[in-house]
Structures are given as structure tokens and as C-alpha cells.
């Protein structure tokens, strides 16, 4: 456990750089403006958090945090998922619904599986587990949710993204490069700090004492109760 914790930071950096490199290639091939994708991420991350919060309220009768980060109601899974769908499915607007559905279901299943694996191997935490559901794949995704991804892909390509794209084009702040850059830097710092807080949380649970000033800062400002309030469904590996 201690050895895994010791090298987890390097593992996160390596996998993160690989993901960024892959996304950059996909974005370049899609021809979609990077600034627009940043706004797609921000809007989708916000809407995803709101949808999940309302869903939990309706299903369980309680208000539960569904945010992926320490600051702000943003779901990174939804945000990145929207960007992935936008980039991968670009150019498929005129394709038959069945084709978009199958490609979207396949991509969505891979995306959900990779997200689950990534958070478990890097953060030592499990945020969802579908082992109890039939036709699940390693507990990380299942055929039912892959079908949901397929349906969402059709709706995204045929209706949501075209409308969102036009909405973004009309935003005055979209044409201010500085605002877009500030949002991007904010979310990157927010995600990095959130990951650091989660890693330190798993270290504390494993009995690892703070050994650096950063560890001490995180322990003083992001105690267990705060982490568990933001991520109430999180399970330790």
C-alpha cells in the first residue's frame, strides 16, 4: 500500500499526459475549435452535476453532492464525456441513427470503464460499482448503461450539440479568449487539487502521516469530513 501511494503521483501524471495527448490528436482531427470544446466541457460538467443531484433527490429523497471537484458544482465525468462524444462523433450528423447509437454505445462503455479504472488505480477510490447488475463488465460498466450512452449519443449529435454550439457562439464571453483561458486554468487547478486531496485522504485512511508541507496543508484544509461530504458514495479500494 505504501509503495502504491509513493508512486501514485507519477502514475497519475503519466496517464494524464497520455490522455491529454490522445485528446489533442482527436481534437485536431475533428477540426473543432479548442475554445468551443472548453465551453462544451464547462456547460456539460455543470448540467451533469445538476442532473445527478436532482436524480438523487427524486430517487432517494435527499440532497447529495455529485460534484467531482472541491470547488463548484462540476462533474468532470460528464464534462469530459461531452467532449469525447463531440470529438469522436463529429461528422456523423447525417449518418443513420443505428450507426450513431452503436458507435456511441461502444465509445461510452469504453469511456466509463476507463474512468472507473483510472480513478481506482490512481486515487485508490471507487466511485461506482455495477457488480450487482446483470451483464456488467468488471463492475465498471454494463450493457444497459452502454445502451444509455448510445441513446445519449444520438440525442447529442442530432439535437443537443448543434443547439449548444449555436448557444456558445452567441455568448459574448466566448469571444473573449482571456475568459476562456481563465476558466480552463481554474478547472485544471481545481481538478489537480481535488486529486491531491483524494490521494491524501486515502493516505490518512492507510495511516500514512503527513511528510511534506503540501500534505500538512491538505490535512489542515481538506479533512476527512469535508472529503466525505463532497464524495459521499466513494469507496476505498
Which residues does each PLM region occupy?
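Aromatic-rich, lipid-facing transmembrane alpha helices and their immediate juxtamembrane interface loops
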Residues: 1-237
Amino acid at each position: 500500500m505504501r509503495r502504491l501511494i509513493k508512486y501514485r503521483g507519477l502514475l497519475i501524471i503519466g496517464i494524464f499526459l497520455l490522455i491529454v495527448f490522445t485528446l489533442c490528436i482527436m481534437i485536431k482531427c475533428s477540426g473543432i475549435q479548442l475554445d468551443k470544446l472548453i465551453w462544451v466541457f464547462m456547460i456539460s460538467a455543470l448540467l451533469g452535476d445538476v442532473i445527478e443531484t436532482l436524480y438523487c433527490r427524486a430517487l432517494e429523497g435527499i440532497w447529495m453532492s455529485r460534484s467531482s471537484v472541491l470547488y463548484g458544482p462540476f462533474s468532470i465525468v460528464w464534462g469530459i464525456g461531452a467532449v469525447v462524444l463531440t470529438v469522436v462523433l463529429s461528422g456523423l450528423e447525417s449518418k443513420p441513427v443505428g450507426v450513431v447509437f452503436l458507435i456511441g454505445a461502444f465509445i461510452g462503455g469504453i469511456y466509463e470503464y476507463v474512468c472507473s479504472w483510472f480513478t481506482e488505480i490512481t486515487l485508490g477510490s471507487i466511485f461506482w460499482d455495477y457488480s450487482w447488475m446483470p451483464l456488467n463488465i468488471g463492475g465498471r460498466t454494463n450493457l444497459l448503461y452502454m445502451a444509455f450512452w448510445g441513446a445519449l449519443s444520438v440525442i447529442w449529435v442530432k439535437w443537443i450539440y448543434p443547439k449548444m454550439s449555436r448557444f456558445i457562439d452567441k455568448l459574448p464571453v466566448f469571444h473573449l479568449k482571456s475568459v476562456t483561458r481563465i476558466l480552463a486554468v481554474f478547472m485544471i487547478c481545481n481538478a489537480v487539487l481535488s486529486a491531491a486531496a483524494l490521494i491524501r485522504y486515502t493516505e490518512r485512511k492507510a495511516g500514512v502521516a503527513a511528510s511534506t508541507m503540501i500534505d500538512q496543508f491538505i490535512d489542515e484544509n481538506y479533512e476527512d469530513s469535508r472529503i466525505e461530504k463532497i464524495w459521499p458514495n466513494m469507496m476505498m479500494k
